Amino acid sequence: MSGARSWIAGDLTIERGVLDAILAHALETYPNECCGFISGPASEPQQLTAARREVNEADKFHELDPVTFPRTSRTYFKINELKAARAFEAADSARSPIKVIYHSHCDAGAYFSAEDAATFASDGQLMWPCAFIVVSVLEGELADTKLWVHVPGSNEFRESTLTVR
């Protein structure tokens, strides 16, 4: 895939400082999941050059309605969808689109969970035009980082290559 939004197919390159910022975020929020966005120049679709932390609203939603939102930020992340939509629009307008949503897993692997898949794909369609990075933090230590991309026409995700430069 080349051209517009080719980053959704994966094989991305992330700057070392950007990855370090994401890893630091995951360690700072442990034992709770962190989340955020990664963007890069529209002119270089596979390049990831900036990270932006977002608030994990899982605890807020759990407190308001524990039946509908039974999980807390310990095992779940929730990004405000209205704020996310605005962030995607602003990033596109600035010619530095959001290419990745990242989050951490605490005391679990860097897999893309069934909950993650259900949140970000429905009826074979991707909710946001991006890929996903999952950071694993085990007992307060960084364990793994993986890039996940949507399999078009399905609700499945596959691992892809993430190069650090």
Regions found by a protein language model. Name each.
Residues S104:
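Residue-level "edge-of-site" marker
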